[in-house]
């Protein structure tokens, strides 16, 4: 029996490792981790690995989710433009569910309007975006601030996976 559902947002040129490592880690911890997209049935990652979408964002019920993961790559730049993506992330956040993000994924959180006053990390390439959105950026492998768990880059995936699972374990019903 699943402990809950963590929607993993995917789009064109997603960062391969930042989707697949967390997906497997969450599934090992007992969660369903469907790949959720906004259009195509499948996407290629930056390094060419295919990802077949399990569900469309518009078909997701945010109230049924334990969390959402916004991986990096170039996909967040496209996903952040979709109102359904932003609504899903904002609703999960407002319900107190896990909002996990790594690398360029915080672009989605910025566009959803949920980072002001929060502390998070990301790839240094979007540090200015994070700061200009009103968040406090730190250069650490992973940061947990309330229900937002963030990480910098693929080398931080082990710590990121552990932080996500720790958050979820501390919020199990």
Where on the chain are the PLM-derived regions?
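Catalytic nucleophile serine of serine hydrolases
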Residues: 103
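Extended, subdomain-level signal for the structured scaffold at the beginning of enzyme domains
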Residues: 1-99, 108-119, 127-173
């Amino acid at each position: 029996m699943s402990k809950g559902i963590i929607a993993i947002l995917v789009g064109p040129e997603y960062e391969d490792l930042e989707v697949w490592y967390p997906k497997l880690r969450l599934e090992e911890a007992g969660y369903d981790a469907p790949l959720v997209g906004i259009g195509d049935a499948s996407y290629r990652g930056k390094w060419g690995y295919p990802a077949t979408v399990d569900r469309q964002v518009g078909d997701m019920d945010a109230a049924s989710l334990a969390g959402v993961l916004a991986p990096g790559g170039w996909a967040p730049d496209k996903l952040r433009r979709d109102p359904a993506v932003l609504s899903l992330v904002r609703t999960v956040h407002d319900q107190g569910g896990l909002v996990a993000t790594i690398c360029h994924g915080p672009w989605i959180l910025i566009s959803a309007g949920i980072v002001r006053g929060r502390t998070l990390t990301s790839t240094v390439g979007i540090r200015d975006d994070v700061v200009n959105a009103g968040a406090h950026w730190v250069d650490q492998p992973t940061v947990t601030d309330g229900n937002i768990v963030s990480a910098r880059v693929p080398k931080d995936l082990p710590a990121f996976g552990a932080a996500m699972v720790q958050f979820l374990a501390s919020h199990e019903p």
